[in-house]
């Protein structure tokens, strides 16, 4: 599991940062890639990575401002040229379906695969797919805006080899059933419960994506215990009044959420073009004083999210 940042800027593209998009790579888990927001030129950014559009199966849109959606029509069109691609689902606020369909209609673009739309309105579970759940809640922005929490199911514990050795169980169907936590009957009539031969479950990973918003209480439960929190940081920590007026957040506000909600790593994202070089470093340093495990991400940065308990 890995995050790759395709656009980390705010409002408009700059030479240093494209507008918003981040890819959640679930290649080992699902052989899929999920995108969160698709700002203008996202598909150009993808050309500079190893991402293949045929692997993109879900797109989550936080809100309908142009710097988060203007890349959608072109990306969807290009995906049609990738051969035999499967269906794609777009999750987003009311209006996202109209935006896509009108853009494709006016440009007379034909899509070779089904697109399903899930328009968001209420907080809660919006997606469940083979061991992953995605939850959403409203944020506080000028227009309807949503944050996302991706939760991986727990994994079975490790097989207790020493305990199995007591019963002289060889490799084969019986061992396979025990690994799956099933009950089995031995030749002598002994009943073994696979759950007794597995260590504690390994908790799944949690990724939280927060785009445009003021500091608001709904972020807390979306971010709770996240392995990685990607949080907008449009303003510096000493500009909270300006951030509030423009319906955005500061680096320090993001760091306070990370500390409060037991987050493991904070990625500052959605960086205004006013912050370059030393000024960008200032945002990161301000946040680190509150939450040390903070990084300010740049376009094409990759963040690995290892299994809990992994030494990687």
Swiss-Prot record:
Q: Does the keyword Zinc apply?
A: yes
The superkingdom of the source organism is: Bacteria
Q: Which reaction does it catalyse?
A: Endonucleolytic cleavage of RNA, removing extra 3' nucleotides from tRNA precursor, generating 3' termini of tRNAs. A 3'-hydroxy group is left at the tRNA terminus and a 5'-phosphoryl group is left at the trailer molecule
HAMAP family reported in the protein's UniProt record: RNase_Z_BN (MF_01818)
Q: Which GO terms describe its molecular function?
A: 3'-tRNA processing endoribonuclease activity; zinc ion binding
Q: Record-annotated residues binding Zn(2+) 2?
A: 67-68, 212, 270
Q: What is the lineage of its organism?
A: Bacteria, Bacillati, Bacillota, Bacilli, Lactobacillales
Q: Which cofactor does it need?
A: Zn(2+)
Quaternary structure and interacting proteins, as annotated: Homodimer.
Report the function annotation for this chain.
Answer: Zinc phosphodiesterase, which displays some tRNA 3'-processing endonuclease activity. Probably involved in tRNA maturation, by removing a 3'-trailer from precursor tRNA.
Question: What's noted on cofactor binding?
Answer: Binds 2 Zn(2+) ions.
Main EC class of this protein?
hydrolase
Q: Which residues bind Zn(2+) 1?
A: 63, 65, 141, 212
Can you name this protein? Ribonuclease Z
Q: Which organism is it from?
A: Lactobacillus acidophilus (strain ATCC 700396 / NCK56 / N2 / NCFM)
Active site positions, chain numbering: 67
UniProt keyword annotations, A-Z: Endonuclease, Hydrolase, Metal-binding, Nuclease, tRNA processing, Zinc
């Amino acid at each position: 599991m890995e995050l790759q940042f395709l656009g980390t800027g705010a409002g408009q593209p700059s030479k240093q940062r494209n507008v918003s998009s981040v890819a959640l790579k679930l290649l080992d888990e699902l052989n899929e890639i999920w995108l969160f927001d698709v700002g203008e030129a996202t598909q150009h950014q993808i050309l500079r990575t190893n991402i293949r559009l045929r692997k993109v199966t879900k797109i989550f849109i936080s809100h309908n401002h142009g710097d988060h959606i203007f890349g959608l029509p072109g990306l969807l069109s290009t995906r049609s040229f990738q051969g035999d691609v499967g269906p794609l689902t777009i999750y987003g606020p009311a209006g996202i379906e109209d935006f896509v369909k009108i853009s494709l209609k006016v440009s007379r673009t034909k899509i070779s695969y089904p697109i399903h739309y899930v328009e968001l309105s209420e907080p809660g579970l919006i997606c469940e797919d083979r061991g992953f759940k995605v939850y959403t809640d409203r944020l506080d922005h000028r227009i309807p805006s949503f944050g996302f929490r991706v939760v991986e199911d727990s994994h079975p514990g490790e097989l207790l080899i020493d305990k199995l050795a007591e019963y002289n169980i060889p490799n084969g169907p019986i061992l396979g059933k025990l690994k799956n936590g099933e009950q089995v009957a031995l030749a002598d009539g002994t009943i073994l419960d696979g759950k007794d031969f597995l260590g504690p479950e390994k908790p799944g990973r949690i990724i939280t994506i927060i785009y445009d918003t003021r500091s608001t209480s709904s972020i807390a439960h979306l971010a709770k215990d996240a392995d990685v929190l990607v949080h907008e940081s449009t303003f510096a920590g000493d500009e909270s009044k300006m951030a509030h007026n423009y319906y955005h957040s500061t680096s320090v506000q993001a760091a306070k959420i990370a500390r409060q909600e037991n987050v493991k790593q904070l990625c500052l994202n959605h960086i205004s073009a006013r912050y370059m070089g030393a000024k960008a470093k200032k945002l990161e340093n301000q946040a680190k004083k509150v939450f040390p495990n903070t990084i300010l991400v740049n376009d094409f940065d990759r963040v690995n999210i290892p299994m809990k308990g992994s030494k990687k």
